[in-house]
Design a protein with these regions (language model features):
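Glycine-rich phosphate/pyrophosphate-binding loop shared by adenosine-nucleotide-utilizing enzymes
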Residues: 62-63, 79, 197
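Primarily recognizes the serine-hydrolase "nucleophile elbow" in alpha/beta-hydrolase
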Residues: 158-207
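Short, flexible loop/turn elements at secondary-structure junctions
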Residues: 55-59, 69-71, 86-88, 122, ...
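Short alpha-helical segments and helix-capping/turn motifs at coil-helix boundaries
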Residues: 50-52, 62-67, 94, 100-103, ...
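Cap/lid segment of the alpha/beta-hydrolase catalytic domain
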Residues: 74-165, 205
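Generic recognition of flexible, low-complexity loop/linker segments
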Residues: 41, 53-54, 103-104, 163, ...
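Non-catalytic accessory segments flanking enzyme active sites
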Residues: 1-69
Length: 207
């Protein structure tokens, strides 16, 4: 239906958000338990740094990624961008001429923004609950009580929570961008979480 104003869109969006959360198994949202972030392995590249991160998105379930931070010369707060990856063998470490998640995050950091590249379920370091192709295909996986898209979206929500804990981050300027499956994750996060000031899903499910 035609939406004539911002207010009309907010009214239209509310039931869409609710329907999406129900379909994802995220209604009501799970409890936001402590993230217990661990940041290690700092590498200094001159005008930016790269660190390894783990956060506990569910009790006993850990999400891993890399945090790219600019070397700031002032105390001003900066934007922060989530960078979910697509269905590529290398996951968040993909570095090809067609596209590179590390290069994208380095670019953001060099432009004065914090960037967090984190694993899709079953990739790289985030494999403790199985593979994304077979998740919930067996009774043990189903004991988690959440579907794959819901789990991935919850990981994105908690990754956004993590960015909000960083002292240099401007919480009013949070964003998300990704390609392919990362574009789908960007789309879904923006659908259920209104904290994003900007989102750029690329080559995702609707194309």
């Amino acid at each position: 239906p035609h939406v004539a104003s911002g207010g009309a869109w907010k009214a239209r969006a509310a039931p869409i958000r609710l329907q999406a959360k129900v379909a994802l198994g995220l209604y009501p949202l799970p409890e936001r338990t402590p993230l217990n972030p661990v940041i290690t392995g700092r590498v200094d590249r001159g005008d930016y740094t790269v660190e390894n991160v783990s956060i506990e998105t569910h009790p006993g379930y850990f999400l891993y990624g890399n945090l790219y931070r600019p070397k700031l010369k002032t105390d001003r707060k900066v934007p922060a961008i989530l960078n979910p990856h697509g269905h590529w063998a290398e996951g968040r470490l993909v570095n090809r001429k067609e596209g590179s998640v590390p290069a994208r995050c380095i670019n953001f950091a060099k432009r004065g923004m914090v960037a967090f590249a984190y694993d899709m379920f079953g990739y790289n370091d985030t494999k403790q609950a199985g593979d994304h192709r077979t998740y919930a295909n067996d009774l043990v996986s189903q004991l988690w009580g959440i579907n794959l898209m819901g789990l991935q979206t919850w990981n994105s929500i908690r990754a956004l929570d993590f960015l909000e804990t960083l002292p240099e981050v401007d919480r009013s300027r949070l964003a998300c961008t990704g390609g392919s499956g990362g574009g789908t994750q960007t789309f879904m996060l923006g659908l259920v979480d209104d904290r994003l000031a900007a989102q750029a899903p690329c080559v995702m499910v609707s194309h």
